[in-house]
């Protein structure tokens, strides 16, 4: 039988695996729960976690045992307190140990049947009533702020697991960061994740039957579904016992991602076996490891002080117009070529580009063909707009074009029906030969993408001049001072958005300081966008205010932009903008990060980045575009005298921002250790570096995570990633030349990684990793097997 048909049959057989849970619906609830816990990070470590573990053992499990024995004790579903549910969540992610503990203390596995999550249910009042009746001295909801004063002697309990739940929680705490991007909740993405999870289990089943010892490592989409399945304890036990004869272990204790270690070889082996068995690529856009959880900007959650109106996104459109751009993440691999003339075998490569170049991807890149490169796996990872087509041109080593073909994005993304495809594309010969060639050259192309999402809006502040064409953006902060000069604001296409000017107010007192930011559109319309009254800046008809903060912390916020939302401005690149790899070449003093604090994001969400040196503002949210642009203009103007040093507060104050003594409202609780969000990462994934490189494309660098499990005859591990190149600098050491420069360096913007995809970035700008990725699936011996 043809190999491709065999691989299709294998995939179809894998999809027949019976799972007794609606994993797609359950995964959506799972994501909501992880988000709720992340808004209460005191549950990741410290006194609140210790108290939660005590309450879980002393109160929740006994209550659950009574309920599973007789649901009549509670009218309606049982709803666990958030803290108890979190510990329960982490306990169940060691399914073998959870099963053993439940059977030891309660004689049976305690399931979630009839239980509704604390974040999904609106019917917890009945559970609260039952809780108060059974535990009159213990509140249903844990007081996180005062948890430190409450006893938590777990060892004194009669029924208590010896499993180290503190470490279990710490290992799982970083997982949410890996699955928190918007596309993960997309139905098509989750449907494909469920299908890939079944294929993952199918590999394990086959390995057991053939006595192959392979430490299987899932990507993050698979791991999300795997976790979701384990949370349904009885279903997981029954489904896996039926499939492989035992409960599949999930061991997340191994976090060493070094070259040649178990995680590294495991991901390599899983990739090779997957692609050999199913004829599909294992690496998938949006499912790879994002890197270590960024360092938090605060360990104390922000508490909203009253309701605030939500900014209308249309407000900015009344003043400025800018293009709305969608973006997708793409992973591309050229798998094979057939009907290639013998004279060209082993000597070909592919040039790929977009038929409609855009602000994110506008260059031609080179990729090797896997089947023609002695097993060296080269994969391109990039972002682009979901428009036009990907164009491929097969080239010989003598730079001779052998033909071209293309793949349209609209085939899959308008609407989103499929997020990955692997197919043969017939080439159109560059030079017409025989009219009807019975065996045309064809390329096997594998591409995956994330669902389209809104791309950040990037505006550049440049000195006014006749034309920008053919020259680099001039930095806004140049030493030249021109009376009454305007600063042009242009978008990524170099289209003028508005002109800005700082000027003294006409009604200012002779010795007073009453300045204004004036905006002038091309049509001549004039707007007063901001006014300084001597104490702070008032923006956009007093809808926003900009002031300096008083924060003694070395890394605390420098400025506060408040209005319809609370935004704090920090020096350097923070959170999602945290520099990765080659992007570290830029000085952190060149940047400021805008971080929004809200009920949904009490620890802050990066919503914008100001590049002081090259005069640009990147806004991740539409509501930030206008106030962010005006604030950037003000801050750039005030800080330019200090050589971008944000520490010179006295000079800043003298230039128009008064220091405020008010502090953020915070919960009264012991500060969490920063290491909670940094070093305890045992799902350890790594790094989507969002730095733009020459040509506007984005280069992603990935490393392997380490959330591992072992299983006899089919060892399994945690989330994998892929190796890649780092981001690079553009014009003038990191800027972009007119928004349309050609690609140079950084491996041409394409990333390579071995089948392991493990832990090693491509060593710096321009370097590429090469690995043998697509050999026959190896039989990897493991030195330890857990029960």
UniProtKB/Swiss-Prot annotation:
Knockout or disruption consequences: Delayed growth and development. Late flowering and increased sensitivity to salt stress.
Keyword Acyltransferase annotated: no
Keyword Zinc: no
Expression induction or repression: up-regulated upon auxin treatment.
Pfam entry (one): GRDP-like
GO biological process: auxin-activated signaling pathway; cellular response to osmotic stress; regulation of auxin mediated signaling pathway; regulation of photoperiodism, flowering
Tissue expression pattern: Expressed in leaves, inflorescences, buds, flowers and immature siliques.
Keywords of the record: Auxin signaling pathway, Stress response
General function of this protein: Involved in development and stress responses, probably through an auxin-dependent mechanism.
Name of the protein this chain belongs to: Glycine-rich domain-containing protein 2
Source species of the chain: Arabidopsis thaliana (Mouse-ear cress)
The gene coding this protein: GRDP2
């Amino acid at each position: 039988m043809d190999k491709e048909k065999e691989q299709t049959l294998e995939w179809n057989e894998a999809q027949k695996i019976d799972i007794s849970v609606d994993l797609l619906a359950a995964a959506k609830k799972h994501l909501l729960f992880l988000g709720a816990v992340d808004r209460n990070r005191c549950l990741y470590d410290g006194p609140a976690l210790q108290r939660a573990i005590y309450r879980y053992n002393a109160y929740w499990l006994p209550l659950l045992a009574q309920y599973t024995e007789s649901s009549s004790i509670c009218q309606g579903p049982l709803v666990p307190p958030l803290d108890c549910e979190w510990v329960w969540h982490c306990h169940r992610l060691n399914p073998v140990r959870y099963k053993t503990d439940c059977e030891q203390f309660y004689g049976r596995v305690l399931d979630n049947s009839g239980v509704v999550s604390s974040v999904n249910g609106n019917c917890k009042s009945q559970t609260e009533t039952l809780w108060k009746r059974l535990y009159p001295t213990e509140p249903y909801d844990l007081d996180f702020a005062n948890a430190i004063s409450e006893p938590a002697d777990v060892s004194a309990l009669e029924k208590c697991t010896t499993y180290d739940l503190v470490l279990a929680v710490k290992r799982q705490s970083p997982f949410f960061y890996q699955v928190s991007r918007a596309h993960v909740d997309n139905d098509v993405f989750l449907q494909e994740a469920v299908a890939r999870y079944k294929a993952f289990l199918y590999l394990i089943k086959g390995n057991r039957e053939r006595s192959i010892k392979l430490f299987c490592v899932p990507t993050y989409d698979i791991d999300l579904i795997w976790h979701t399945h384990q949370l349904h304890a009885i279903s997981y036990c029954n489904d896996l016992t039926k499939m492989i004869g035992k409960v599949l272990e999930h061991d997340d204790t191994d976090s060493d991602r070094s070259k040649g270690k178990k995680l590294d070889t495991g991901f390599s082996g899983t990739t090779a076996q997957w692609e050999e068995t199913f004829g599909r690529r294992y690496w998938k856009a949006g499912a790879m490891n994002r890197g270590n959880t960024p360092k938090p900007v605060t360990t104390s959650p922000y508490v909203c002080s009253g309701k605030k109106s939500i900014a209308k996104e249309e407000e900015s459109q009344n003043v400025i117009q800018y293009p709305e751009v969608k973006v997708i993440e793409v992973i591309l691999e050229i798998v094979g070529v057939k009907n290639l003339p013998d004279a060209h075998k082993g000597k070909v490569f592919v040039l790929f580009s977009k038929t409609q170049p855009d602000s994110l991807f506008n260059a031609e890149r080179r990729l090797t063909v896997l089947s023609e490169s002695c097993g060296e796996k080269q994969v391109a990872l990039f972002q682009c707009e979901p428009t036009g087509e990907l164009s491929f041109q097969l080239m010989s080593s003598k730079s001779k074009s052998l033909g071209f073909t293309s793949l349209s994005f609209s085939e899959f993304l308008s609407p989103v029906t499929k997020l990955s495809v692997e197919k043969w594309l017939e080439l159109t010969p560059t030079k017409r030969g025989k009219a009807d060639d019975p065996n045309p050259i064809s390329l096997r192309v594998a591409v995956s993408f994330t669902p389209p999402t809104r791309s950040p809006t990037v505006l550049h502040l440049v000195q006014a001049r006749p034309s920008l064409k053919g020259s680099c953006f001039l930095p806004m902060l140049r030493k030249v001072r021109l009376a009454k000069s305007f600063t042009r604001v242009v978008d990524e296409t170099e289209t003028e958005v508005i002109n800005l000017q700082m000027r003294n107010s006409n009604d200012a007192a002779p010795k007073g300081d009453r300045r204004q930011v004036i905006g002038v559109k091309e049509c001549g319309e004039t707007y007063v966008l901001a006014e300084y009254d001597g104490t702070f800046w008032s923006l956009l008809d007093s809808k926003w205010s900009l002031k300096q903060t008083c924060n003694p912390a070395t890394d605390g916020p420098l400025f506060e932009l408040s209005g319809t939302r609370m935004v704090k401005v920090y020096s350097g690149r923070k959170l999602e903008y945290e520099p990765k790899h080659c992007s570290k070449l830029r000085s952190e003093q060149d940047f400021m990060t805008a971080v929004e604090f809200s009920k949904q994001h009490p620890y802050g969400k990066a919503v914008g980045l100001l590049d002081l040196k090259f005069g640009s503002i990147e806004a991740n949210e539409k509501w930030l575009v206008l106030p962010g642009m005006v604030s950037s203009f003000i801050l750039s103007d005030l800080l330019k005298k200090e050589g971008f040093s944000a520490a010179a507060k006295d000079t800043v104050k003298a230039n128009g921002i008064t220091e405020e003594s008010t502090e953020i409202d915070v919960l009264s609780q012991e500060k969490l250790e920063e290491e909670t969000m940094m070093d305890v990462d045992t799902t350890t994934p790594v790094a989507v570096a969002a730095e733009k490189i020459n040509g506007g494309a984005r280069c992603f660098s990935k490393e392997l995570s380490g959330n591992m499990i072992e299983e006899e005859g089919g060892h399994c591990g945690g989330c994998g990633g892929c190796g890649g190149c780092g981001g690079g600098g553009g014009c003038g050491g990191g800027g972009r030349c007119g928004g349309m420069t050609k690609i140079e360096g950084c491996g041409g913007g394409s990333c390579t990684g071995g089948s392991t995809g493990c832990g090693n970035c491509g060593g710096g700008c321009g370097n590429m990793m090469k690995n043998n990725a697509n050999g026959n699936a190896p039989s990897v011996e493991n030195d330890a097997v857990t029960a």
